[in-house]
């Protein structure tokens, strides 16, 4: 059994037990979150596709950690003009494990 869900503007194909790094969710570590935007569910060879979401379907996940990704360095410059700007960005993420798919 698997499900296709959307969170943080991205889509993920998940099964029970999968560990994901998703865009930051407002949840405490070791708490559970319900992801209700389930686009498709496959069970016993039968695929149910929502329009746009599957009615009554949800994915229950447990938050393992909150953190920041590796730093991305943004360096802008204009040649011959002594213009240089160095900037860094670390995207926050949430590490979750899929506990249950309900459909």
UniProtKB/Swiss-Prot annotation:
This protein binds to 23S rRNA in the presence of protein L20. The gene is rplU. Signal peptide: none annotated. One of its GO terms (biological process) is translation. One of its GO terms (molecular function) is rRNA binding. The lineage of its organism: Bacteria, Bacillati, Bacillota, Clostridia, Eubacteriales. It comes from Clostridium perfringens (strain 13 / Type A). It holds the Pfam family Ribosomal_L21p. Belongs to the bacterial ribosomal protein bL21 family. InterPro entries: bL21-like (IPR028909), bL21-like_sf (IPR036164), Ribosomal_bL21 (IPR001787), Ribosomal_bL21_CS (IPR018258). SUPFAM superfamilies: L21p-like. Part of the 50S ribosomal subunit. Contacts protein L20. Keywords: Ribonucleoprotein, Ribosomal protein, RNA-binding, rRNA-binding. The keyword rRNA-binding applies. This is Large ribosomal subunit protein bL21. One of its GO terms (cellular component) is ribonucleoprotein complex.
């Amino acid at each position: 059994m698997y499900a296709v869900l959307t969170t943080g503007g991205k889509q993920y194909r998940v099964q029970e037990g999968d560990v994901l790094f998703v865009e930051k969710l407002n949840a405490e570590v070791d708490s559970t979150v319900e992801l209700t935007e389930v686009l498709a569910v496959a069970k016993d060879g039968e695929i149910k596709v929502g329009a746009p979401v599957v009615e009554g379907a949800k994915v229950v996940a447990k938050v393992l950690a909150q953190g920041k990704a590796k730093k991305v360095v943004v360096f802008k410059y204009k040649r011959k003009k002594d213009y240089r700007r160095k900037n860094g960005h670390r995207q926050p993420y949430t590490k979750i494990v899929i506990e249950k798919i309900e459909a």
